Amino acid sequence: MNYLFWSLPFLVIILLFVFYFGKIMLKVLPPKVKNYHLIYWISLIILIGFNIYLRTPLMGFLIYFTLFHMIYDLLRLLSYPFKKVNNFLKKLNYKEYPILVISILFTLYGVLNAMHPVVTSYNIKVDKQVDEPIKIAFISDLHLGTPYLNENFQNLIKTVNEGNYDIFVLGGDIFDEWTTEKEKEHFFEILKEIKTKNGSYYIEGNHDVLNEETYQKYTSSGVRVLQNEVLLIDNKYYLVGRKDKMTREVQGLEQMLKNVDMTLPIIVLEHQPTSVKELEENKVDLSISGHTHGGQIWPANYFVKYGYYDNGYSKSIISSGYGEWGMPIKTTYHSELVSITIY
């Protein structure tokens, strides 16, 4: 049932791709052979399906080509009672060139943006005594196997090692359904190069498969896997790692924090953002999460959370992730390593 639930939206999107792209190309390409309509539509479905499977940047182009055509058609429909405006819009998209050019520009920007991750820094003041600043390096949503990521991950290791961080956190969705075993093995070898004062930590995401084998590989790479656990780090602050909500095994914060010293800072790590109400009720100083990708594809960023939130007592940081899912483009926020200093 869940498979059907998630498959239907993708099927609708693919049909929209085929409809808009096919409709335009049938205008541009003259008929050359018998039954060319049927041949063309079948070929187009195969082409789009092939690019979805390979996760190429063309997927981004198809999304924007379809989206801008839908917006254009909606404007034409709304302006129908106003003949001059309607005629202007009709002339504006001369032979589809404007929408074609805009779609290409959005796609190129998304590719370049995905290729160049940035360091996003936050300085967080908490309402508890912090004798020395706590420095955290956090990444999530690598989705290893996405193009550009292998080289970027080498640069990431260098950045973390030069940053003099207290801890390094992997915030889930490190792998996904497309990650190969070779890519996983390479990743675990690179993880061994991470150097921080108090170690590296991992929480699982909704795309991760945390079986016994994967658990052991993280451990062998020097990474502590947190599954509904509370750790006291260096006798200075608590690190709370929760299982992902999709596992249906996540514990409530009230239960997890019942034996902690509430005079010390409490930092909650969870792949999907925790509810503000639960954070506030349990006096959590900071929660760090990912999952949303910052929307990844404009205008999805208007419908998800990203960045820093002051909830009152507690603070939240939601990362856009270090990688991309589904296709190697990002037209919303940058791919990022989140650098946090708590004082």
Where are these regions (language model features)?
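Short N-terminal secondary-structure initiator segments
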Residues: 1-2, 109-122, 179-188, 257-258
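Non-catalytic terminal accessory segments
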Residues: 1-115
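N-terminal signal-anchor transmembrane helix
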Residues: 78-139, 145-162
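Aromatic side chains
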Residues: 64, 69-72, 122, 201-202, ...
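A broadly tuned "polar low-complexity/structure-edge" signature
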Residues: 67-75, 119-120, 150-151, 340
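Soluble catalytic domains of enzymes that build or remodel membrane lipids, polysaccharides, and related
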Residues: 128-343
